[in-house]
């Protein structure tokens, strides 16, 4: 699941990910995707021991902490505030149980609907909303593989 | 992963899912979520042997077959046609390799951006776009658990 979250982060316009815990095999597979499809020059993949220190650092930098949780405020009711929130954004998504600390230290707890579904979907929808869909036109200059969109079938250009 | 796809289908407004293959444990866990959070009256969860027969039946019924694939046409370039496509929609998402047959028998091959990421995210974005975000206000009459959105922390009403 974490792999899908990270691939969504990259494909939907995030600048990188902090991953709590250690998973060498997963990081290796991610770096392979980035090497082929692009993003090596800027997309950060960092394993960390404790997310709380990152949250505190982020606050000191003057950024905004967004926690995506089904218990939060519906994103539809938050949409008009997107323009005013201070960047950079740190977006927190949790797999299983997320500690209460994050709820109380996030600037905003935002729900992608108040129903159980998936942190993968939650991150995708949030990024799609803040970038207003433009992220889906992203091109990666250092990509070795590029897709030529097709009505049916597959067309890919390979370089490098 | 299939569990996440199904939870997204339910939470984002689909009427049900056909799952190719057999996975009793997974179906049981899904039905448990539906029993608690609602949707039992209409949300179909059906295991099937072969997706192709469903596609053919769907066509005979006059519905539209949408295949979500990174090789397809960017959803942003398809958006204006949403109003004209004939319902009901059968949306095909594949985990690993999807057979060429589906590419050539779908009415539309649509890409949620032409980058590798996740079928979970692809389905969520597609449904969010066709329902214009309204699906995130969905309420389930038969729900035994309901969330009261909170700025911080969790508030849930349990009934039945």
From Swiss-Prot, chains A, B:
Subcellular location, principal: cytoplasm
Which terms in the Gene Ontology molecular function aspect does this entry carry?
A: tRNA (cytidine(56)-2'-O)-methyltransferase activity
Q: Which top-rank group of organisms is this from? A: Archaea
* GO terms for biological process, alphabetical: tRNA nucleoside ribose methylation
Q: Do you know which InterPro entries this protein is assigned to?
A: Alpha/beta_knot_MTases, tRNA_m1G_MTases_N, tRNA_mtfrase_aTrm56
User: Where is S-adenosyl-L-methionine annotated to bind?
Assistant: 68, 94-98, 112-119
The entry's localization annotation reads: Cytoplasm
Q: Does the keyword DNA-binding apply?
A: no
Its family remark reads: Belongs to the aTrm56 family.
Name assigned to this protein = tRNA (cytidine(56)-2'-O)-methyltransferase
Q: Which organism is it from?
A: Saccharolobus solfataricus (strain ATCC 35092 / DSM 1617 / JCM 11322 / P2)
């Amino acid at each position: 699941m974490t792999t899908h979250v990270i691939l969504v982060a990259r494909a939907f316009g995030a600048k990188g990910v902090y991953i709590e815990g250690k998973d060498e095999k997963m990081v290796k597979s991610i770096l392979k995707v980035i090497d082929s499809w692009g993003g090596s020059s800027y997309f950060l993949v960092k394993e960390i021991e404790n997310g709380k220190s990152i949250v505190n650092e982020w606050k000191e930098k003057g950024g905004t902490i967004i926690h995506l949780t089904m218990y939060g405020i519906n994103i539809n009711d938050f949409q008009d505030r997107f323009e005013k929130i201070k960047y950079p954004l740190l977006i927190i998504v949790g797999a299983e149980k997320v500690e209460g600390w994050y709820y109380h230290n996030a600037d905003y707890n935002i729900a992608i609907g108040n129903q159980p579904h998936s942190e993968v979907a939650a991150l995708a929808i949030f990024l799609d909303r803040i970038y207003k869909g433009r992220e889906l036109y992203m091109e990666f200059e250092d990509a070795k593989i590029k897709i030529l969109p097709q009505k049916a079938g597959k067309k890919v250009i390979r370089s490098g």
